[in-house]
Amino acid sequence: HVDHGKTTLLDTICKTNNVSFEVGGITQTIAAHDIEIEYKSQKKRIIFLDTPGHEAFSDMRLRCVQITDLCILVVAADDSLQPQSIEAIHYIQKNNLPLIVAINKIDKLNSDILKVKEDLAKHNIISEKSGGTIPIIELSALTNKNIDNLLNRIISLAEFQELKANMQNNAIGSILDSYLDKTKGPVATILVKNGMLKVGDFIVVDNFISKIRAIVN
């Protein structure tokens, strides 16, 4: 839901400040963030997709659910579940996706973590501590509290799901966004799910074939 701190959380993780540049303080596009963390003495990469929380962008949220490997539901501790939070839960459950709940803003004086968990339980989201299967991380994006716990749970859940790509295969992925640049020509933001994409390769989208002239990460 809007204002629950999704972009602020990603800013904290990625050490960026994207929230300051958003029109009206809300995310209006799907943004991809590629980060590397250390997990059990190994380097691990995570690609985050930041989705808009405003009600006007439900199609974007559904699109992300359809292409992601696992979901992080960010809920503000001082606001609990709101209409777009519930909508996201329905999308996640319908697509049977692995879920981690991040209860954000626990640093606020009016935070009510118990209410958030009770509201989540109404939608069959029960924490591991209460006998369920869903990891629920209580954190603060503002103070950096328990951010490491969230990242570790993401990696451990991904390993449990055996999410591995075969770099020898032809690339398969999804186009998150595309536009026509006056100097570069057609530009697309692509999430590669499997295989490797290289300059000079051809990509096929519906009935269109395009050659890759440049790749920027």
Which role does the model predict for each range below?
Residues H1-L49, A188-N194, D201-V204:
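Conserved G1/Walker A P-loop phosphate-binding module
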Residues D3, S20, Q82-P83, I103-D112, ...:
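Ordered, soluble secondary-structure elements with a strong preference for glycine-centered loop motifs
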Residues D3-G5, D11, G132-N217:
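Conserved catalytic-core segments of large NTP-driven translation/proteostasis enzymes
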Residues N17-G24, I37-K44, F57, Q82, ...:
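Active-site phosphate-binding and catalytic loops of NTP-dependent enzymes
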Residues E22-L70, A77, Y91-Q93, S178:
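Switch I (G2) and immediately adjacent beta-strands of P-loop GTPase domains
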Residues E55, Q66-I86, Q93-L114, V187:
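Conserved Switch II/interswitch segment of TRAFAC-class P-loop GTPases
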Residues K105-G132, K145-I155:
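GTPase G-domain guanine-specificity segment
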